[in-house]
A protein has these predicted regions:
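Switch II (G3) loop of P-loop NTPases
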Residues: 1-16
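Short, well-ordered beta-strand core segments
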Residues: 2, 24-25
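An anion/phosphate-binding loop that grips the pyrophosphate of nucleotide cofactors and donors
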Residues: 21
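G-domain G4 guanine-recognition motif of GTPases
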Residues: 29, 54-68, 91-98, 113
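Conserved C-terminal guanine-recognition region of P-loop GTPase G domains, centered on the G4
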Residues: 35-54
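Beta-strand-loop-alpha "switch" segments that mediate conformational coupling across diverse proteins
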Residues: 82-107, 120-123
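NTP-binding/hydrolysis catalytic cores, primarily Walker-type P-loop NTPases
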Residues: 107-157
Length: 157
């Protein structure tokens, strides 16, 4: 797995990098601006990412119901306007211990385990690792696809 945190929006070079992966995981908070940024990123990835598999992870959700509702609405919008299927990859709950750990400059998964957010990350990571397609990613993963997409015979001097 390679994690690319693009913040709001996505740069052209980041799109090429992400498009070389077998799957992109969009992480979104349940805030209008974050949802708009995730949709804009999705639109760019659909235009340049080819057959890239897509998933949505909701961060800082008040509840599982809020995360599910956000995924369903995002999926409906993505399917209607972009023809994109977005898998639900779970959620990480809003957790006051995260803010406290940031103030103390300590990773929250180490500062106060088991916090709700740390447990959420563990569940998401476990689900990603258990997926059957992981064994196949080695054949078509990031670096294999990057080599296919780039013309490495021409070098910039």
């Amino acid at each position: 797995f390679v994690l690319v945190d693009t913040g709001a929006g996505i740069a052209a070079k980041s799109v090429d990098f992400v498009a070389a992966a077998a799957e992109a995981l969009l992480i979104v908070t349940p805030e209008p601006t974050a949802i708009a940024d995730a949709y804009a990123t999705l639109k760019v990835l659909r235009q340049r990412g080819g057959d890239l598999a897509l998933g949505l992870l909701v961060n800082m959700a008040d509840s599982a119901a809020e995360a599910t509702d956000l995924h369903e609405k995002f999926q409906e919008m993505a399917l209607r306007f972009l023809g994109a299927e977005i898998d639900n990859r779970g959620y990480i709950p809003l957790d006051r211990y995260v803010r406290e750990a940031v103030k103390r400059q300590i990773p929250f998964v180490l500062a106060s385990p088991p916090t709700p957010a740390a447990e959420g990350i563990g569940e998401v990571a476990g689900a990603l690792l258990e997926r059957e397609s992981i064994s196949e990613l080695g054949r078509t993963g990031l670096f294999a696809r990057a080599l296919q997409q780039r013309n490495w015979s021409k070098r910039a001097d």
